[in-house]
Amino acid sequence: MKYLRKLGHFAERLAKAGSNDEGDIVTIIAGQTYILECKNRKSINLPQFWAEAQTEAANYAKARGVVATPPAFVIVKRRQHGVEKSWVIQDLDQWLQDRSSNAST
């Protein structure tokens, strides 16, 4: 969160809500809302992390009455590296949508 703010982006930590958890951080970059699920673990379980991020983004949208669920990404902190070297996990469809959106602006 501090890193995103340092770069000038809106970023806010989301409250934990058990089964209704909405992700770890909401950020707005170039007018687009994103939900970030942040992990700092020795063992990486991408399918579990990904499912959690997608569920929590849907919870975020539902709690706010938003029709479109914002894109969710998993941020995995690399061991022995700073936050700026974290891995960002997204699926191919999201990546292609981001490329298409950026090409039209």
Question: Residue locations for each model-derived region?
Answer:
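Catalytic phosphate/metal-binding cores of nucleic-acid and nucleotide-processing enzymes, i.e., regions
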Residues: 1-105
